[in-house]
């Protein structure tokens, strides 16, 4: 082939390449669709069956890779949604509570609330659930006058060791003399808030006025700081783990001396003139005011209603037999607690240790009333 022929041939090749390239970059699908046309009359230029093997393979490769990424993202999304759902799913009673484990005692009330005894709850399930919730639990305690020096340090020290281990805890300590509060070193996740309260002339008024004080603190700050709140007497000491099995909307404590007695034998307030009045023939259990709790809003309602009854009695010049405890029992008769704690959670060793008390969680201190209630 002469030189002129070679030049013409080269120009034809270059022109062909340019045309091919121009068709490629202007193709809406980004491939060599316009090079290959099917001879099948049923397949027109816009058919997905048109194409060249290399760009078709390349595009399919990209498509498959992108599809895999999309599938992976969707799967991750589903897993994240499932995780969030698992974290927020309400824990059902029968997921963690087995009343048949303690057939010798009352484990379920007439209104289907659990009575928590050692052995009836699955600690692992409860801990797993509440750990995901990242809860904070509050604990209020009053130490007035000599109660500070006789009981406060041992109460808080034992609570630091056994109360809601592994979860955030705020101790709300109410005293009449901040200068007497001992230094107590707390563990991780624990904090200590001290508040000075006005002292009362009589110990009965101290006991009753705590309902007003707790309610005021819940409204002022506690409701924004904790998920659950317990209110306890200071003359007690923790003996074993007092954990998340005790948490609930409203929680009442069985009184150790009365948990086997007939309701007509309970020391309820029996005078009709009192706002705490409970007639014979009524009553479920006798509840101990040394421990009660629940969500902040429920505890607020408990304290406000009890204090209303106390004020009404004062107006009528009457005082309930067991003061705030009488009003608490009247409240729980009308507003059934969602959970009840067995006497194991507040035991008096003076009773002895019967076979149904498996593990004492919290015990009464020796009541030195002549000492601590003399000019408190």
UniProtKB/Swiss-Prot annotation:
Gene: GGTA1
GO molecular function: metal ion binding; N-acetyllactosaminide 3-alpha-galactosyltransferase activity
GO CC entries: Golgi cisterna; Golgi cisterna membrane; vesicle
EC number of this enzyme: 2.4.1.87
Catalytic residues, chain numbering: 325
Organism: Callithrix jacchus
Gene Ontology terms describing biological process: carbohydrate metabolic process; lipid glycosylation; protein glycosylation
Protein's UniProt name: N-acetyllactosaminide alpha-1,3-galactosyltransferase
Domain comment as written in the entry: The conserved DXD motif is involved in cofactor binding. The manganese ion interacts with the beta-phosphate group of UDP and may also have a role in catalysis.
Cofactors named for this entry: Mn(2+)
Membrane topology, Lumenal segments: 28-376
Listed transmembrane segments: 7-27
Membrane association type: Single-pass type II membrane protein
Cystines in this chain: none
Keywords (A to Z) from UniProt: Glycoprotein, Glycosyltransferase, Golgi apparatus, Manganese, Membrane, Metal-binding, Signal-anchor, Transferase, Transmembrane, Transmembrane helix
Taxonomic lineage: Eukaryota, Metazoa, Chordata, Craniata, Vertebrata
Cofactor binding, per record: Binds 1 Mn(2+) ion per subunit.
Reaction catalysis annotation: a beta-D-galactosyl-(1->4)-N-acetyl-beta-D-glucosaminyl derivative + UDP-alpha-D-galactose = an alpha-D-galactosyl-(1->3)-beta-D-galactosyl-(1->4)-N-acetyl-beta-D-glucosaminyl derivative + UDP + H(+)
Residue ranges annotated as Cytoplasmic topological domain: 1-6
């Amino acid at each position: 082939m002469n030189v002129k022929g070679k030049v013409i041939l080269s120009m034809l090749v270059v022109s062909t390449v340019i045309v091919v390239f121009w068709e490629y970059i202007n193709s809406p699908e980004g491939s060599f669709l316009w090079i290959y046309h099917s001879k099948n009359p049923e397949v027109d230029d816009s058919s997905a069956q048109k194409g060249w093997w290399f760009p078709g393979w390349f595009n399919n490769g990209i498509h498959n890779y992108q599809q895999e990424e999309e599938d992976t993202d969707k799967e991750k999304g589903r897993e994240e949604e499932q995780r969030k759902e698992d974290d927020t799913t309400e824990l059902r009673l029968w997921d963690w509570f087995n009343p048949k484990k303690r057939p010798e005692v009352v484990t379920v009330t007439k209104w289907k609330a659990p009575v928590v005894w050692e052995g009836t709850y699955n600690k692992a399930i409860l801990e797993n659930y509440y750990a995901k919730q990242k809860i904070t639990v509050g604990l209020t305690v009053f130490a007035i006058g000599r109660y500070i020096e006789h009981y406060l340090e041992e109460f808080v020290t034992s609570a630091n060791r056994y109360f809601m281990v592994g979860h955030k805890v705020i101790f709300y300590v109410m005293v009449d003399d901040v200068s007497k509060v001992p230094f107590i070193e707390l563990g991780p996740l624990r904090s200590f808030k001290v508040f000075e309260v006005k002292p009362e002339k009589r110990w009965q008024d101290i006991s009753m006025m705590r309902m007003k004080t707790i309610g005021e603190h819940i409204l002022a700050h506690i409701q924004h700081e904790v998920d659950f709140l317990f209110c306890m007497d200071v003359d007690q000491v923790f003996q074993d783990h007092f954990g998340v099995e005790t948490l609930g909307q409203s929680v009442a404590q069985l009184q150790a001396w009365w948990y086997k007695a007939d309701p007509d034998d309970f020391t309820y307030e029996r005078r009709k003139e009192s706002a705490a009045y409970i007639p014979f023939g009524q009553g479920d259990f006798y509840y101990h005011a040394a421990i009660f709790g629940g969500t902040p809003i429920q505890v607020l309602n408990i304290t406000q209603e009890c204090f209303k009854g106390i004020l009404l009695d004062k107006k009528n010049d009457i005082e309930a037999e067991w003061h705030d405890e009488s009003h608490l029992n009247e409240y729980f008769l009308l507003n059934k607690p969602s959970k009840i704690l067995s006497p194991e959670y507040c035991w008096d060793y003076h009773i002895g240790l019967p076979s149904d008390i498996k593990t004492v969680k919290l015990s009464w201190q020796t009541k030195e009333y002549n000492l601590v209630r003399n000019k408190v």
